[in-house]
Amino acid sequence: MADAAPAGDAPPNAGAPAGEGGDGEIVGGPHNPQQIAAQKRLQQTQAQVDEVVDIMRTNVEKVLERDSKLSELDDRADALQQGASQFEQQAGKLKRKFWLQNLKMMIIMGVIGLVVVGIIANKLGLIGGEQPPQYQYPPQYMQPPPPPPQQPAGGQSSLVDAAGAGDGAGAGGSAGAGDHGGV
């Protein structure tokens, strides 16, 4: 610097720390412009180094934080995988259980259906040893009597004549007995 030295023997940088001048300059040595420029570059480089060190510290802290979060995520993923495996096993067991229940229900419904069809078929006479009931005449109508059996000639003609005499058919014998029964 171009300041004049104060009066006395004291150097101009007497209050500065040892090794540096009052303006941050190095004490002892010529103060030419090259040294001043070199010193400024050194200070700028030192500031840049300090800035890079701070950035690196921040980055290292972030990397450590990221690592802890990644390990936590890995633990969660393992727990989730284990839970998914257990869920899959339980779902398989439940599926088999309900499949068996469904199968049992289908078998029961099939047996019930067969029993109902069998009962209906039995009532309709489609199966079983019994014949369906034949048509019966209503009570007000009488079914015609079956024709009397044929009698041999000679031995019992008196009974036939007595039965036939009430009809007014005359004495026709056994030949006329079967002719008037179907009216």
Curated annotation (Swiss-Prot):
Main localization, broad class: membrane
Locations listed in the record: Cytoplasmic vesicle, Secretory vesicle, Synaptic vesicle membrane; Early endosome membrane
Topology, Cytoplasmic side: 1-106
Tissue-wise expression: Specifically expressed in neurons and synapses.
Segments for region (Disordered): 1-32, 135-183
Keyword Secreted: no
Domain v-SNARE coiled-coil homology: start-end pairs: 41-101
Membrane-spanning residues: 107-127
Membrane topology: Single-pass type IV membrane protein
The keyword Coiled coil appears for this protein: no
Swiss-Prot/TrEMBL keywords: Cytoplasmic vesicle, Endosome, Membrane, Synapse, Transmembrane, Transmembrane helix
Tree of life domain: Eukaryota
Role this protein plays: Involved in the targeting and/or fusion of transport vesicles to their target membrane. Major SNARE protein of synaptic vesicles which mediates fusion of synaptic vesicles to release neurotransmitters. Essential for fast vesicular exocytosis and activity-dependent neurotransmitter release as well as fast endocytosis that mediates rapid reuse of synaptic vesicles. Also involved in a neuron-specific sort-and-degrade mechanism that promotes endolysosomal degradation and is required for neuronal maintenance.
Family the UniProt entry places it in: Belongs to the synaptobrevin family.
Protein name: Neuronal synaptobrevin
Source organism: Drosophila melanogaster (Fruit fly)
Gene: nSyb
